Curated annotation (Swiss-Prot):
This is Xanthine phosphoribosyltransferase. GO terms for biological process: purine ribonucleoside salvage; xanthine metabolic process; XMP salvage. It comes from Porphyromonas gingivalis (strain ATCC BAA-308 / W83). Its EC number is 2.4.2.22. Homodimer. Xanthine binds at L20, N27, K155. Belongs to the purine/pyrimidine phosphoribosyltransferase family. Xpt subfamily. It is found in: Cytoplasm. One of its GO terms (cellular component) is cytoplasm.
Length: 193
């Protein structure tokens, strides 16, 4: 997605340790027009997947997930990082955050993730695939089917895609970062695998 790639190169910031900061347009302050185009592309990519529910994890996945849900006319549910006192019938798993260097016990109400669901997971980043693996675990607990996973940005050098594809998950990323070596952002061309 050329518009996204240009924005990453223009406004993305690189930090040592493989960190790409896009908080000025994706995951703190959001460019709503860019987010709409992102959602349109995910809706196009997964139009024939049979998805009936969008799932994300708080917090940065919520905005794109809501937009995808709106365009596809589907409900959106987000996995919570803190258990509400009011949540019953809960499914839980542990997810490690790469950027925050900590584990979270995340949860979702089984009322909102069931064996009738064919879910599309939407998130801002795919790095090592930790959040995505957590979603797979929750889906398995609920006997829900994952029809695909869509990521705004993938850091290919952290190999999250391979781990997901080994489990038979369809992965679509709108911008694939090949390298952040020497804090230089290298984005894959459309024709690269």
């Amino acid at each position: 997605m050329e518009l996204l790639k240009q924005r990453i190169l223009q406004d993305g910031k690189c930090y040592p340790g493989g960190i790409l900061k896009v908080d000025s347009f994706i995951n703190h302050q959001m460019d709503s027009k860019l987010m709409y185009h992102v959602a349109e592309e995910f809706a196009r990519l997964f139009a024939d997947s049979g998805v009936n529910k969008i799932v994300t994890i708080e917090a940065s996945g919520i905005a794109p997930a809501i937009m995808v849900g709106y365009i596809m006319n589907l409900p959106v549910v987000f996995v919570k990082k803190k258990q509400p006192k009011t949540m019953d019938n809960m499914l839980t798993t542990t997810v490690h955050s790469f950027t925050k260097s900590r584990d979270y016990t995340v949860c979702i109400s089984h009322d909102f993730l069931t064996d009738d669901d064919r879910i599309l997971f939407i998130d801002d980043f795919l790095a090592y695939g930790n959040a995505a693996q957590g979603i797979i675990d929750l889906a398995e607990q609920a006997s829900a089917k994952i029809v695909g996973m869509g990521f705004i940005i993938e850091k290919a050098f952290q190999n999250g895609r391979e781990a997901l594809q080994e489990r038979g998950i369809r992965v679509e990323s709108l911008a694939i970062i090949r390298s952040l070596d020497n804090c230089c952002i290298t984005i894959a061309d459309e024709n690269e695998d």
